[in-house]
């Protein structure tokens, strides 16, 4: 099917998101199978899943990068992004959600809402992404559809409404009652679930289904209060409401984020996946439903609103970079307005650099098809972009628009890295540069005192997998040091500095004079450097050099050399010499000035605090809490169900190395835990002194 056959209202850009092991990739595999994209079902546990195409993913059985693919169903074109569920790969989820119009949240019928489900849900709230939910693994021991829905309401604050009533559960799960059509679907094993029989509702479920349907209709009546005819029917004659009417109101409720309908099934056992595909098309929004995209016009500084139209000016967002051994650098983009043609020259407005598109590719996991153009609503990949990275805006050369960026969280863990042989030094530098372009949460820096190269990321698994990729994709063997905490420094009060950099050594000298004011910025806002120079006391051609010097000075703090964060710097005054001043002199002076100001601004060291969730048998609860307290943990809450307790706490990362091993020995291997970065906080004075001594 060519794209020309699809209007914007028939496009669905969706993500599949969940906690690790909820069965997200298996669900996507079934979608590909039923929509005719694959002829054999790939199994994750056999390492044959189409979407998990990186070698490490097939070995580890987890999804690391967001694979993109396109399928066709009920006359609609569905672009699907399968996102990772492990906390170390949060940026993959974040950048997918930024470019999606809707999402399917997959939950495990036994566990319900798990810690990573909460993280992903919060990220989707941030971007206002409409969601439907699929309670998967209904065939597992202990599966509880209504329990999972209850946990969605309690933990996520979701307006979770069942649209199915399961028939049987665990090994007896055979199908479900569709509360909208009031039909019972029994799946036929011999057709791999591709066919089912429709029957009447079993007698023992009739009363429960009637109650659930009434609750569903009453909830829908509150979605659109202007639809008085629907409300009247719900109150006076609910049996007269047609399926069509229900779907219309449901779609409105989902798109406005007022309702999260919940389906059930077992992707592994091929039950319920086509029903999920049906409602993706019926209820999730098209690019038109998501409305205009907002950006900033760089020439005027004003906010602009772009209609999703293929005839409008080009506005696209780069949301992922990938390096391919055969094709080179691939940039994934989402087009919000206009059309992008192969061979066209465009502007990266974020960087103010011109780019040229050499090829356009439609992706199916790691297979690709060449395309001549992409138009509004498409998600695709381009080859030939040299400067564009995650979060950059691409637009027409005469239409300078910048879209909202993708925020990357600060890394929390550092490791020293060096090539195994001196000859690999150049290759290692290239590999690190390529990987940090692909992944904004992976940073590379140099320790100024030791000269060591330091890599920083979101967790041990994150850095471990990147090291694997260096060996496999870039053929670089590297030694890595022990993981260390990625501390930061910041300031706690306002201060200023006046710095002169003067050098006379025969011939032309060096002269620069810079006055700065610095103050603490809001936590999480990052560093800001602004020039308040008036009257040309520092000529405007030297201002960028001062700013660059200040930024470089902030890269290493004054207490223990850790990068400074959340500092606002204003360049307020200075002077220059007609002959001796130069860009280099002002850059050096800017760096010296910011260091001097920081020393006077009561600097402190910050450490990453992790949100830790432990699920333990109740008889070990006291030991687990005692152990978290000893690790400087702050217990946030605990809850119990079925002899198991869940404890959530905030604990400094520096206290969490080797935690899994000690948790296993505390609980005889019966407890599990997850942790994710929460925020940075000031370290206690005594620990700060120890860090500075090191």
Curated annotation (Swiss-Prot):
Q: Which GO terms describe its cellular component?
A: cytoplasm
Q: What does this protein do?
A: Catalyzes the GTP-dependent ribosomal translocation step during translation elongation. During this step, the ribosome changes from the pre-translocational (PRE) to the post-translocational (POST) state as the newly formed A-site-bound peptidyl-tRNA and P-site-bound deacylated tRNA move to the P and E sites, respectively. Catalyzes the coordinated movement of the two tRNA molecules, the mRNA and conformational changes in the ribosome.
Q: What is this protein called?
A: Elongation factor G
Q: Which domain of life is it from?
A: Bacteria
Task: Kindly indicate where the leader peptide sits in this chain.
Answer: none
**Source organism phylogeny:** Bacteria, Pseudomonadati, Chlamydiota, Chlamydiia, Chlamydiales
Tell me the GO BP annotations in alphabetical order.
ribosome disassembly
Report the Gene3D superfamilies cross-referenced here: 3.30.230.10, 3.30.70.240, Elongation Factor G (Translational Gtpase), domain 3 (3.30.70.870), P-loop containing nucleotide triphosphate hydrolases (3.40.50.300), Translation factors (2.40.30.10)
The organism named in the record is Chlamydia trachomatis serovar D (strain ATCC VR-885 / DSM 19411 / UW-3/Cx)
Keywords per UniProt: Cytoplasm, Elongation factor, GTP-binding, Nucleotide-binding, Protein biosynthesis
Question: Chief subcellular site?
Answer: cytoplasm
Q: Where is the tr-type G domain?
A: 9-288
Compartment(s) where it occurs, according to its Swiss-Prot or TrEMBL record: Cytoplasm
